[in-house]
Amino acid sequence: AGNLENLKGLEKKGNYHFIRADISSASVMRHIFEKFRPEAVINFAAETHVDRSIMSPAPFIKTNVIGVGVLLNLSLKYNVKKFLQISTDEVYGSILRGSFREDSPLDPSSPYAASKAGADALVVSYYKTHGLPILITRSSNNYGPYQFPEKLIPLVILNAMNNKKVPVYGDGMNVRDWLYVEDNCEAIDLVFHYGRIGEVYNIGGENELTNLFVVRFILKLLNKSESLITFVKDRPGHDRRYSLSLGKIRRQIGWHPKISFETGIKRTIEWYRKNQKWLKNAQSGEYRNFYKKYYSKLGLKEI
């Protein structure tokens, strides 16, 4: 889901250096740590798409588990002062009532979620065993500008704008908590600076909505017919509901989400409308191959 175009504008900043590399490559990562001697590591690097993890879990294990292990070893060796692991609410699994707290048991359902849960456990182990100063954030479903078009919201926006079918898994009643990307970034920044070492922090948007509601809302904003909705066979192991308790991050750091779903989704739609070139580039190559292969199995050949 990475895209170099997302980094435009950073090239001229003196403290910015881009290196294209695989975090699971210990030799390459060792060279980077040796050269730059980072004081802190914030690990956003991950394979993140659940559908891809079901089709091909190996890259998820390689990046999300082995890669994190490489970063932890090097952080320990080079005396990194703070290691922040970016994780996901999916490590908790599904919850029908109530909300997950940071001390809730991990019960991942998909290979993606399992790889992130494994990484979280590894990160915590380096704190307990070696005293590495770590933090973990677990965010709910992100959305907003620059999101790769394989994810639900940009997929719906893109297909609807082009009058193509919009796939909805199962009955569409799966609930997700939608977090605008700028809210997430603000929370991560605050956790990095003010979070307590060794702690986990949930980050949510307090916008719990069914997938079907989200799809219908986007279609309404785009003045498109709901006839574009096509219900497809449910995803294996599809979690029914995610919900995060934000009590800890409110009490300890004073953060709360600020962007409502209506405001955030309108901003997102407008961004995709204005950035057709970015979309075209993002949809080329591997994305297009995956898209055709995966959705053709669901009977959506026109996509």
Predicted features and spans:
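The catalytic Tyr-centered alpha-helix of NAD(P)H-dependent dehydrogenases
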Residues: 97, 108-115, 145, 149-153, ...
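Generic recognition of short, well-ordered alpha-helical segments
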Residues: 5, 31, 52-55, 147, ...
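Proline-centered turn/helix-capping motifs that create local helix->coil transitions or kinks
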Residues: 84, 96, 131, 147, ...
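C-terminal substrate-binding subdomain of Rossmann-fold SDR/epimerase-dehydratase oxidoreductases
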Residues: 21, 154, 160-303
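N-terminal Rossmann-like NAD(P)+-binding domain of SDR-like oxidoreductases, especially those catalyzing
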Residues: 1-142, 211, 267-277, 281-303
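Short, conserved catalytic or interaction motifs in soluble domains
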Residues: 38, 145, 205
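Amphipathic coiled-coil/heptad-repeat helices and related helical stalk/stem segments
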Residues: 3, 25, 152-153, 184
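Short, well-ordered alpha-helices that flank and scaffold nucleotide-derived cofactor binding pockets
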Residues: 34, 73-77, 124-128, 158, ...
